[in-house]
Structure formats: C-alpha cells, structure tokens
C-alpha cells in the first residue's frame, strides 16, 4: 500500500435495524447467562416494520421471557412510537428457537467426543488487530465513526436535540501521509429526524453539536461534511430496512483496517470461537502493541470443530515489529491460552456482558466488562522480548 492515501470506515447507531437485531440477540444471551452461564446459545433476530422474529438454537435450563427481553431492548434503544419505524409496545414478536444439535454438542462439551478438552464450536478463522493510531490502540477511522454515532445517540436521549430519531450512520475518510493519519477528508452522517425539520437546521446542528465535539479539531482541515446527503431521512429503523443479526461485522470490528474471518458475534455464547477467539485475537494484538513490540499487529487464529488446540496461529506486524513476527508468534503461544476453554477463563466470558458490546464496536472501548481490552500481558511480553 502507498504511504499517502485515503482510508474510510463506517459505523451505525444503536437504532440501525441490523444493530437492533444484534442488541436483541445479545440481550437474549445475557438474560440466559444470568441464570445459566453454561448455556449454549445461538440467537438470531430479524426485525421489520412492526415485527420481530427470534430464531436459532438454544440449550438451557434458564426460564426467560424472550418476548419481554425483545420488547425491553427495543424500548431502551428508543423505538417507542410507531412513527419511528417500530414500537416496542405494539410490535409482534415470534419465537422459534430449537436446541443445539447433539452432534455439535459432543464436540464442544468437555469430556465428550474425540478430543476430551472443550473443543471449538465450529471450524473457522478469526483475526485480531491493534495499532497505535489512537490511545485505545484502534484504527482512527472506525474509532471516530463510532464516536460520532455514539454522540448522536447521547444528544437524542438527553433531549438536547429532541428531533433526532434512533437510526443513524456515520462514515469517516482519513487522509494518510507517510502511513500516518493527518486529517479528515470527509465525514458523512445520515441521521433519522422528525419530519418537520429543515435540512439546513439539521446540517448545522450535526456539524456543530455532534461531529466537532468528538473529532480532533486539528484534523478538520478542508474537511467535507455530508449531512443527510439525500436531503431527508424520516423513514428509518426496521421500517426503512429489514434488520438481521450479524450483518454489521466490519462495524463491529476494525472498520476494514484488518481482515475478517466472516463469523458474526452477537447472540453467540463463547463456546462459539467466531466470538471468543476474535475477542482473544484483539486481546493478543493489543498487548503486542501496548508492549512496544510493534506499531501495528494482526493475528490470525484458526480452529477445527471439536478440537481444542488452534490449527494455526499467525502474527504479522507489517514491518513495524521490534523483533521478528515469528518470535512474536512464539511469545503469543507462550503467554496466551488460545484453546476455547482457555479463552473463556482468560477473559472471564461466562457472564451477562454482551448486550453492551452490540452497538458502537466490540473493540476499542474502555468498559470494565471488556476484559479483552486489558493490557495486563504487555509487561511480560516486553520482558520476554528483552526490550
């Protein structure tokens, strides 16, 4: 890649229909985990105008009112009026959960199947990434895209901009010089709004009250602002588009700055390595960068269903490493247990912590529950690398 370039990432608000689905799925997971931390959950959600469909595979002894959980989630997001696209009070909720296949369960249950350790819940490949572009060790474009829609939600909920509605999308294009971000070329924010609002008033409020408070002022050099570029955004949420769990996997991770293995996160308990190993990958990569071993770090981890040990672990630092990538990979294997059970224990994942992850990014947020954001291995890695 050339050292001078433009790079873009997007985010969406909690009221985006796909994120509504993600949050319902993770709210279901949390409600189950409050009673049964060892449950097997794969909760999928579809939401459309006035309709929510809950489907997937759940094996648990927990007694959960799934319909009430879905309604409470929609209410918390802010869809309390049918004019907004869906109303938690009047929407229909259909429940169609099956149990986990026993063929899968025997490969995941510890002490069953061919590998007596807890095996991976499926085959697949997962990526973790970190870089030094922000204090959170996240790529800058996705970081600021998240902060913009997070700010939109804040001003909507606290009443400072009461004409805002729940659905919104942001996009940030950064200008890089010599491989480092130096300014913002373009910011896009499309936000749902009350029908009586005029475009010029929306544009002014968005730029001054939403965007400027959360992006570096020194990066706003000849920046182009595109606010509701279609001119109107009244119909939104599940009425504007059908929402589905797992359809915002790039928003959930690194905004396209790193590869993605394809597996979504929300609604999945941590026996699914799609989720738990991606969290572990972030934990590993962030500690590599925090230790000063590299300015950028990417790890790929892969698994076979029913097998505990990863089938491969690869680290690349894009030429920024202080020691070789092979040496860093060896340190990773020595300091991190990447077997499914090891990940669950290392990151304390059998807790009802997941609904909070389902909007504004699973990574790069300093929340106390987000154990994969800790840098508690950095000192040991640095010492082992003799730096």
From Swiss-Prot:
Q: Which PROSITE patterns match?
A: ADOMET_SYNTHASE_1 (PS00376), ADOMET_SYNTHASE_2 (PS00377)
Q: Which organism is it from?
A: Herminiimonas arsenicoxydans
Alphabetical list of Pfam families matching this protein: S-AdoMet_synt_C (PF02773), S-AdoMet_synt_M (PF02772), S-AdoMet_synt_N (PF00438)
Q: Which Gene3D superfamilies match?
A: 3.30.300.10
Where found, per UniProt?
Answer: Cytoplasm
The residues that the entry says bind L-methionine are 57, 100, 241, 272
Give the protein name, as stated in the record.
S-adenosylmethionine synthase
Quaternary structure annotation from Swiss-Prot or TrEMBL: Homotetramer; dimer of dimers.
Flexible loop: annotated span: 100-110
Cofactor dependence is on: Mg(2+); K(+)
Q: Tell me the CDD domains matching this sequence.
A: S-AdoMet_synt (cd18079)
What's an example GO cellular component term for this entry?
Answer: cytoplasm
Task: Specify the pathway.
Answer: Amino-acid biosynthesis; S-adenosyl-L-methionine biosynthesis; S-adenosyl-L-methionine from L-methionine: step 1/1
Give a short account of what the protein does.
Catalyzes the formation of S-adenosylmethionine (AdoMet) from methionine and ATP. The overall synthetic reaction is composed of two sequential steps, AdoMet formation and the subsequent tripolyphosphate hydrolysis which occurs prior to release of AdoMet from the enzyme.
């Amino acid at each position: 890649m050339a050292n001078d370039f433009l790079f873009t990432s997007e985010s969406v608000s909690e009221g985006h229909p796909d994120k509504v689905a993600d949050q319902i799925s993770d709210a279901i997971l949390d409600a189950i985990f409050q009673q049964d931390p060892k449950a097997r959950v794969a909760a999928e959600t579809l939401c459309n105008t006035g309709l929510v469909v809950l489907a997937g595979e759940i094996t648990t002894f927990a007694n959960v009112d799934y319909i009430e959980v879905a309604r409470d989630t929609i209410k918390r997001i802010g869809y309390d009026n049918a004019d907004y696209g869906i109303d938690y009070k009047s929407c229909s909720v259909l429940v169609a959960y099956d149990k986990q296949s026993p063929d899968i369960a025997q490969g995941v249950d510890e002490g069953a199947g061919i590998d007596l350790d807890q095996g991976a819940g499926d085959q697949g490949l997962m990526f973790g990434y970190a870089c030094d572009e922000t204090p959170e060790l996240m790529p800058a474009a996705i970081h600021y895209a998240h902060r913009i829609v997070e700010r939109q939600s804040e001003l909507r909920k606290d009443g400072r901009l009461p004409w805002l509605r729940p659905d919104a999308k942001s996009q940030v294009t950064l200008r890089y010089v010599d491989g480092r971000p130096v300014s913002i070329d373009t910011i896009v924010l499309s936000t749902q709004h009350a029908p009586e609002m005029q475009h010029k008033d929306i544009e002014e409020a968005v730029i001054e009250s939403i965007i400027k408070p959360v992006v570096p002022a020194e990066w706003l050099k000849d920046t182009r602002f595109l606010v509701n570029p279609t001119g109107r955004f009244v119909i939104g949420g599940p009425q504007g588009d059908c929402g589905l769990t797992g359809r915002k996997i790039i928003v959930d991770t690194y905004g396209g700055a790193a590869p993605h293995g394809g597996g979504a996160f929300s609604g999945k308990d941590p026996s699914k390595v799609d989720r738990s190993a991606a969290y572990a990958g972030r934990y590993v990569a962030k500690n590599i960068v925090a230790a000063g071993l590299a300015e950028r770090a990417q790890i790929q981890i892969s698994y076979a269903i029913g097998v505990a040990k990863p089938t491969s672990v690869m680290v690349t630092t894009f030429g920024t490493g202080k020691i070789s990538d092979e040496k860093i990979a060896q340190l990773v294997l020595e300091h991190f247990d990447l077997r499914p059970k090891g990940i669950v224990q290392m990151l304390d994942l059998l807790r009802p912590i997941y609904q909070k992850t389902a909007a504004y990014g699973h990574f790069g947020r300093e929340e106390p529950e987000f154990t994969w954001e800790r840098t508690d291995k950095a000192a040991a890695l640095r010492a082992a690398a003799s730096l």
